[in-house]
Amino acid sequence: GTKALGYTKIGNDCLIMATSHIAHDCVLGNHVIIVNGCGIAGHVEIGDFTVMGGLSAVHQFGKIGKHVMISGGTLVRKDIPPYVKVAREPMSYAGINSVGLRRRGFSNDRIFEIQKIYKYLFQSKMNVSQATRFIENEMPPTEERDEILEFIKNSPRGIVKGYGTGKE
């Protein structure tokens, strides 16, 4: 079996709306919004400032980075790296969460750098392994770059696919 925490931890200033379910051994960061009717299975980790649209569900052991926006009705079966939006069925990358990032004081330059990283990951001809190596070697280190790369490296189930690319 799995070694459980024995508790679920919910951060500060979270909003959990009606009929949502958060299962055992989950960890939610601060300022997380869970809209009506969401289901979060056991052992899920959700980063700060993430918003889950209504009737979304996260598969057990899922990892969701910070500043993520999950569209309503999305079934989350893969990990979602920080700063992105996901939507559709099957779930796929839908751009970066630029509105959320601006609301939280990210400069246009920081947002542009995040967009550049995800362009290499999801809109180039490289697969995720090639893109992460390229980003690591060719882009200057920033807090966001390092966080994205660390998240991807530590994702046991793999990350969301790029829209229409079929690449993971």
Predicted regions and their residues:
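Terminal amphipathic alpha-helical/low-complexity segments used for targeting or macromolecular assembly
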Residues: 89-168
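Structural signal for interior beta-strand "rungs" in well-ordered beta-sheet cores
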Residues: 1-92
